Curated annotation (Swiss-Prot):
Gene: fusA
Record protein name field: Elongation factor G
Residue ranges constituting the tr-type G domain according to the UniProt record: 8-283
Localization (cell): Cytoplasm
GO biological process, one term: ribosome disassembly
GO CC annotation, single: cytoplasm
Keywords from the named record: Cytoplasm, Elongation factor, GTP-binding, Nucleotide-binding, Protein biosynthesis
Length: 699
């Protein structure tokens, strides 16, 4: 197969969903039917091929997105298995960044759940074409048609139903293919490997005709010629329908909806056919956004094998046999083992050693990879998640990923001095793998503090520290990751002088600090940042080489705010003037001056304490609504909406994280164990003054 042609044959897809919708089982079945997995792994027995970390097998949830390559028909499918638990949305976000298409798996009983909405919104952000697989059609209470309605109501999506279920709950035995207008039935005894086509059952003829008409109405809109044909009563061919479904899926005009039961081995092969037929190849995506290093210009780069090499590192993993593995998505050009490329974000050269194609936890050595491929590189020194690897002669930086601020923190200390050094190494390794996990030192207590996206996130990282790095540690109680900010513009002129004997130090800085939301001319790339620095020095008042010292000083000192020592966020610092001394000035002197200017200037900016606000969704039977709403109000919650769902009520509220510790037990007793809840980070907001006083007193 020629290299150019090969791009058309690649499908880079993610399989994403809410926890427990059956995502890992679906991936397992795909690997089984594409011949990559010799036995079917069951998640609830702790044996799935994709869930290869020990904790994943015990908990039955997927944590790291393992990348797997398999083949179907004559196509190469690279699958990224993404986690569905809300604490791991960072994993979903970074895998979506490098995918061309996705399969969203929904639970046929529960329908669209909170995490499904989060993942859907993330996929919208990266414009990922996707299709929907309504799974668990064999379960008690499964309702395909309700699921389709929920796709419209809760996601605002335009579903295009291309299959209907045959039989319900335990009698589910196959699907109706609305393109071919045939029923596809699976033989139970053949592990789903054998299935056959037959005529649509008589009792489903009318429903199939109704949904076929809806399908045609939607797809013919995309092509005037086919629409004329359809309106004049001519038959639209299966090939024409497929071509238009592909066109509409790639342009996100609609989302094809399929159904099945991965666990019962029904519906997986047609799902694979649909991945190949309807989801885009890298050629359909066409371009990737980035910046040309030599000119600093933003550009669209074509996805092509003949262009210079450019790839994005989207995941780092520690492999027990190979060591550190960096997963990259190649957007253009090709890469050969043994060559040298440049990390354009860090401006460091990297030698390409071993290159691997991954199959869950097995690996295959390869010598060459090209545009469209997702491969793992062993032994890179300086590359972290979100970095670009590029051709040395034509350097580009691809669009970077954004990572959310952590909302929860824990103090950890090693149990023995032997653990001390190992813990430092373990934490830095884990932080390199996961950009939403941060490690810092509390300056006052000297304790090591780890920060993450939720209790489960930190629990699993501590568990990995014990298992993989053999580090025993004492763990403190979870703490809320408060932040600080300023609410008004302030200016400070500060001179740092130390000129009494010996080498002197001199630096003067004049800095304007302002809340980000009040900055009028904020650049697009700065809109999602928590701290922006700009130099407006003219005429050499501060030489160019000293300005990075000012930025570094501010970046370091903002980790310790002026109210209660929490990191300062959402502000801009502009260096507008300054002075230097020919002999006594240095980068360090300007760093010290910037820190002192921050300490002196920030109190003038009317600083406020911020706390993480969580979006909480509670699903409860009617009779407990009053008590649950009363309890959420008592937790400083603000009710956003109340909607019926089936025979239950769904309450959505914004509640400070500080008030949500231990909520699971309260909810259980309020509802006799019948209500359930989920929460995701929403935003930071000001802490009411009486609560802020208590927090300050504790510090």
């Amino acid at each position: 197969m020629s290299k150019i042609n090969k791009l058309e044959h690649i499908r880079n897809i993610g399989i994403c969903a809410h926890i427990d919708a059956g995502k890992t089982t679906t991936t397992e079945r795909i690997l089984y039917y594409t011949g990559k997995s010799h036995k079917i792994g069951e998640v609830h027995e702790g044996g799935a091929t994709m869930d290869w970390m020990e904790q994943e097998q015990e908990r039955g949830i997927t944590i790291t997105s393992a990348a797997t390559t398999c083949r179907w028909q004559d196509k190469i499918i690279n699958i990224i298995d993404t986690p569905g638990h809300v604490d791991f949305t960072i994993e979903v976000e970074r895998s979506l960044r490098v995918l061309d298409g996705a399969v969203a798996v929904f639970d046929g009983v529960a329908g669209v759940e909170p995490q499904s909405e989060t993942v859907w919104r993330q996929a919208d952000k990266y414009n990922v074409p996707r299709m929907c697989f309504v799974n668990k059609m064999d379960r008690m209470g499964a309702d395909f048609y309700r699921c389709v309605e929920m796709l419209k109501d809760r996601l605002g999506a335009k579903p295009l139903v291309i299959q209907l279920p045959v039989g319900i709950e335990e009698n589910f035995k196959g699907i109706i293919d609305l393109i071919k207008m045939k029923a596809v039935i699976w033989k139970d005894e053949a592990l789903g490997a054998e299935y056959f086509e037959e005529d649509i059952p008589a009792d489903m003829k009318d429903k199939a005709e109704e949904y076929r008409a809806k399908l045609l109405d939607m797809v013919v809109e995309l092509d005037d010629h086919v629409m004329e044909k359809y309106l004049s009563g001519e038959e639209v061919t299966a090939e024409e329908i497929k071509r238009l479904i592909r066109k509409g899926t790639i342009s996100a005009a609609f989302y094809p909806v399929l159904c099945g039961s991965a666990f019962k081995n029904k519906g997986v092969q047609p799902l694979l056919d649909a991945v190949v037929d309807f989801l885009p190849s890298p050629i359909d995506i066409g371009i990737v956004k980035g910046m040309e290093v030599s000119t600093g210009e933003e550009k669209d780069f074509p996805i092509s094998v003949t262009e210079p090499f450019a790839a994005l590192a989207f995941k780092i993993m520690n492999d027990p046999f190979v060591g550190s593995l960096t997963f990259i998505r190649i957007y253009s050009g090709k890469i050969i083992s043994g060559t040298t490329v440049i990390n354009t974000v860090k401006n460091k050269r990297e030698k390409i050693g071993r290159m691997l194609l991954m199959h869950a936890n097995n690996r295959e050595d390869i010598k060459e990879a090209s545009a469209g491929d997702i491969v793992a590189l062993a032994g890179l020194k300086d590359t972290t998640t979100g970095d670009t690897l590029s051709d040395i002669d034509q350097q580009v930086i691809l669009e970077r990923m954004e990572f959310p601020e952590p909302v929860i923190e824990l103090a950890v200390e090693p149990k023995s001095t032997a653990d001390q050094e190992k813990m430092g190494l373990a934490l830095s390794r884990l932080a390199a793998e996961d950009p939403s996990f941060r490690v810092s030192t509390d300056y006052e207590t000297g304790q090591t503090v780890i920060k993450g996206m939720g209790e489960l996130h930190l629990e699993i990282l501590i568990d990995r520290m014990r298992r993989e790095f053999k580090v025993e540690a004492n763990i403190g109680a979870p703490q809320v990751a408060y932040r600080e900010t300023i609410t008004k513009v302030c200016e400070i002129d500060y001179t740092h002088k130390k000129q009494s004997g010996g080498a002197g130090q001199f630096a003067r800085v004049k800095i304007i600090f302002e809340p980000l939301k009040e900055v009028k001319d904020l650049k697009d790339e700065d809109k999602n940042k928590i701290f922006v620095f700009e130099s407006k020095i003219v005429g050499g008042a501060v030489p160019k080489e000293y300005i990075p010292g000012v930025e570094k000083g501010l970046n370091n000192i903002r980790e310790t705010g002026v109210i209660a020592g929490y990191p300062m966020i959402d502000f801009k610092a502009t260096l507008v003037d300054g002075a230097f001394h020919d002999v006594d000035s240095s980068v360090l002197a300007f760093e010290i001056a910037a820190k002192a200017a921050f300490r002196e200037g920030m109190p003038k900016g009317n600083p406020k304490l911020l706390e993480p606000i969580m979006q909480v969704e509670v699903i409860t039977p009617d009779e407990y609504m009053g008590d649950i709403i009363g309890d959420l109000n008592s937790r400083r919650g603000q009710i956003q909406s109340m909607d019926p769902r089936g025979n239950a009520q769904v309450v959505t509220a914004n509640v400070p994280l500080a008030e949500m510790f231990g909520y699971v037990n309260t909810l259980r007793s309020l509802s006799q164990g019948r209500a359930q809840f989920s929460m995701i980070f929403s935003h930071y907001d000001q802490v009411p003054s009486q609560v802020a006083d208590i927090i300050k007193a504790k510090k």
